[in-house]
Curated annotation (Swiss-Prot):
It comes from the Bacteria. The active site is at residue 176. It is an enzyme of class 1 (oxidoreductase). This is Malate dehydrogenase. The keyword Metal-binding does not apply. GO terms for molecular function: L-lactate dehydrogenase activity; L-malate dehydrogenase (NAD+) activity. The keyword NAD applies. Its EC number is 1.1.1.37. It comes from Trichlorobacter lovleyi (strain ATCC BAA-1151 / DSM 17278 / SZ). Keywords: NAD, Oxidoreductase, Tricarboxylic acid cycle. InterPro entries: L-lactate/malate_DH (IPR001557), Lactate/malate_DH_C (IPR022383), Lactate/malate_DH_N (IPR001236), Lactate_DH/Glyco_Ohase_4_C (IPR015955), Malate_DH_type3 (IPR011275), NAD(P)-bd_dom_sf (IPR036291). Catalyzes the reversible oxidation of malate to oxaloacetate. Gene3D superfamilies: Lactate dehydrogenase/glycoside hydrolase, family 4, C-terminal, NAD(P)-binding Rossmann-like Domain. It catalyses: (S)-malate + NAD(+) = oxaloacetate + NADH + H(+).
Length: 321
């Protein structure tokens, strides 16, 4: 049996890190597509020349031709403009919807049997657009947001409590924006509720304030990176997050990862892509895990879904206009 094949659409910062991670983990042969002549070829050659040092054996190819993504097992899309300081993800919708339309047509023609992971912003709208244009089964077209948002939440908790990130369990639901829903009630350190640990450290009132600050920082974490970089947006952490999803599919790991999936009644949502916990395996999204939200969590989820609906509606008006 030959090696798996991963295609990366977009050769920018995230694409470069994705290619390197795929190679280092030997997930499969990698193709990087970008419209900029020479750029993907140069990046892939650079990574390939590190193979004797890093000790990986995979084929790396840069291209300007969608034909080269044929036979892909996984396609990861990062193409589109990144955010700049003062911009929201939603500000990118007009430009990036045009780019995504072209990308989706390429995937439809040459890689319609792949598992597709969208990273491009605004995420919830871009994954919706890609699925509509490709006509691919919804369980094989998803968005990467929740893995990253949850990772940020976990990191802030670990740093606050002075524990290993490996022992923190936490998750966000909803859209990839300022209305995402970090689930405080389920956050734990090796099974111990985070709120209990914060209350031991600070007392009940202060613990609530500290948790609220971490929740808000999680919601605004992407913008925090953008403000510091000044010329672009996060790329290391989004790439690592997408690789976790790709690896679960390529190796049939059946990991439970927060994934932007098309919902059909789950969590009371119909016909919209929203971040929820999903089992990712060889066939794509194999199952969405549902659980009861309390009144506060449900209200936050409803608000987040409303923001997603507004974004998708604005996408529809742009496409019609």
């Amino acid at each position: 049996m030959g090696r798996k094949k991963i295609s990366l659409i977009g050769g920018g910062q995230i694409g470069g890190v994705l290619a390197q991670l795929c190679a280092l983990r030997e997930l499969g042969d990698v193709v990087m597509f970008d419209i900029v002549e020479g750029m993907p070829q140069g990046k892939m050659l650079d990574i390939a020349e590190a193979s004797p040092v890093d000790g990986f054996d995979v084929c790396l190819q840069g291209t300007q031709d969608y034909k080269d993504i044929a036979g892909s097992d996984v396609v990861i899309v990062t193409a589109g403009l990144p955010r700049k300081p003062g911009m929201s993800r939603d500000d990118l919708i007009a430009t990036n919807s045009k780019i995504m339309t072209s990308v989706a047509e390429g995937i439809k023609q040459y890689a319609s049997n792949a598992f597709v992971i969208i990273i491009s912003n605004p995420l919830d709208a871009m994954v919706t657009l890609c699925q509509k244009i490709t006509g691919m089964p919804a369980n094989r077209v998803v968005g990467q947001a929740g893995v990253l948002d949850s990772a940020r939440f976990k990191a802030f908790i670990a740093w606050e409590l002075g524990v290993s990130v490996k022992d923190v369990s936490a998750m966000t639901l909803g859209g990839h924006g300022d209305d995402m829903v970090p689930l405080v009630r389920y956050a734990a350190v090796n099974g111990i509720p985070v709120m209990e640990l914060l209350e031991q450290k600070y007392g009940a009132e202060k613990a609530k304030e500290v948790m609220e600050a971490m929740v808000n920082r999680t919601r605004l974490a992407g913008g925090e990176v953008v403000a510091l970089l000044k010329t672009g947006s996060a790329f290391y952490s989004p790439a690592s997050s997408a690789i976790a999803m790709a690896e679960s599919v390529l190796k049939d790991q059946k990991r439970v990862l927060p994934t932007c999936c098309l919902l059909n009644g789950e969590f009371g949502v119909n016909g919209y892509y929203v971040g929820v916990p999903a089992v990712l395996g060889a066939s794509g999204v194999e199952k969405i895990l549902q659980f009861k939200l309390d009144a506060t969590e449900q209200a936050m989820m409803d608000k987040s879904v409303a923001a997603v609906k507004g974004l998708v509606d604005s996408l529809d008006s742009i496409l019609k206009g």
